[in-house]
Amino acid sequence: MGTKGKVIKCKAAIAWEAGKPLCIEEVEVAPPKAHEVRIQIIATSLCHTDATVIDSKFEGLAFPVIVGHEAAGIVESIGPGVTNVKPGDKVIPLYAPLCRKCKFCLSPLTNLCGKISNLKSPASDQQLMEDKTSRFTCKGKPVYHFFGTSTFSQYTVVSDINLAKIDDDANLERVCLLGCGFSTGYGAAINNAKVTPGSTCAVFGLGGVGLSAVMGCKAAGASRIIGIDINSEKFVKAKALGATDCLNPRDLHKPIQEVIIELTKGGVDFALDCAGGSETMKAALDCTTAGWGSCTFIGVAAGSKGLTIFPEELIIGRTINGTFFGGWKSVDSIPKLVTDYKNKKFNLDALVTHTLPFDKISEAFDLMNQGKSVRTILIF
């Protein structure tokens, strides 16, 4: 392409300060350096994490910043040493790297990478490239990256270990969802919770991640899937995707965990918390059965005070586990998930409620914050 080796000017949505609305600006995107790839983003989606970051509810984030981490695009150019992609390839940028060298990447027990193994402040990870500089500038000032992806920019630069090459015929307006929400929820049920055929499950939170977890539970063969959300308007879609029961805690006269225990005659086999608040986490654990109940934490809620538990809650046989990116070995697994989508093994289309031009990103955030959307796709 004629832009190879040159600075590209394009539009991006910048968060100049914490708690302030995004501003669409013209930014300069520098050429990729060694082991870096510059991508033209075709489609990007909104995730609640992006909104949480913009609202300054994550500690350690540096501003100004270009957020966004759920997208798909086309390789524009590559830096020296890049061998896994070439210009023109369709790709999905990934906040979960795979270096293939560290003890985490070499272990079958985890999908973490040493690059981000310290997740005390996840939003502050990968805000600069390997040489500790940014590839973005605006109005003469450097602009920070986000999660190593920064997909709210028409062009972005990522490390070659944060990138999955996908099939040439992939629909980028759908497979962009594999960059975070779907992969996280679906994988949590299959890879982390390891939901079993005939089991009973409870999924707390029916946003994009929660609905994906419902699909994962169904794919794993669960016989009963209880969806829980404070927005009853989400129940129709949840049932269409596999939920057998739906409960709104605000409509109940006793705690949700007590209701679930009564419904299931003792508690569910698997609970998946896709909301992340302290009360929801506790309810998810409490609604699991004694003996073998499993609770998987997926969501990270801003301002959560954590979870207080007592030993006797676990010594009766319950287990707690967490998930990062649904347990997928990112760069290796995403191409396979793209193929599975093409083969209709799961339904990404059902998660897409709106498609808007990128310039209407503020409208997309309003839809999400008002609970009127599941996933909105923004097109450049």
Swiss-Prot record:
The modification Phosphoserine is found at S121, S278. InterPro entries: ADH-like_C (IPR013149), ADH-like_N (IPR013154), ADH_Zn_CS (IPR002328), GroES-like_sf (IPR011032), NAD(P)-bd_dom_sf (IPR036291), PKS_ER (IPR020843). The keyword Lipid metabolism applies. It catalyses: all-trans-retinol + NAD(+) = all-trans-retinal + NADH + H(+); 9-cis-retinol + NAD(+) = 9-cis-retinal + NADH + H(+); 20-oxo-(5Z,8Z,11Z,14Z)-eicosatetraenoate + NAD(+) + H2O = (5Z,8Z,11Z,14Z)-eicosatetraenedioate + NADH + 2 H(+); 20-hydroxy-(5Z,8Z,11Z,14Z)-eicosatetraenoate + NAD(+) = 20-oxo-(5Z,8Z,11Z,14Z)-eicosatetraenoate + NADH + H(+). Oxydation of 20-HETE is inhibited by low concentrations of N-heptylformamide. Oxydation of 20-HETE is a decreased by 55-65% by either all-trans-retinol or all-trans-retinoic acid. Strongly inhibited by omega-hydroxy fatty acids. It holds the Pfam family ADH_N. CDD domains: alcohol_DH_class_I_II_IV. Keywords: Cytoplasm, Lipid metabolism, Metal-binding, NAD, Oxidoreductase, Phosphoprotein, Zinc. Zn(2+) 2 binds at C99, C102, C105, C113. Its main location: cytoplasm. NAD(+) binds at residues 48-49, 205-210, 229, 234, 298-300, 323-325, 375. Signal peptide: none annotated. It is found in: Cytoplasm. Zn(2+) 1 binds at C47, H69, C180. GO terms for molecular function: alcohol dehydrogenase (NAD+) activity; aldose reductase (NADPH) activity; all-trans retinal binding; all-trans-retinol dehydrogenase (NAD+) activity; benzaldehyde dehydrogenase (NAD+) activity; NAD binding; NADPH:quinone reductase activity; retinol binding. Its EC number is 1.1.1.105. GO terms for cellular component: cytosol; nucleoplasm. There are 7 different ADH's isozymes in human: three belongs to class-I: alpha, beta, and gamma, one to class-II: pi, one to class-III: chi, one to class-IV: ADH7 and one to class-V: ADH6. Homodimer. Belongs to the zinc-containing alcohol dehydrogenase family. Class-II subfamily. This is All-trans-retinol dehydrogenase [NAD(+)] ADH4. It comes from Homo sapiens (Human).
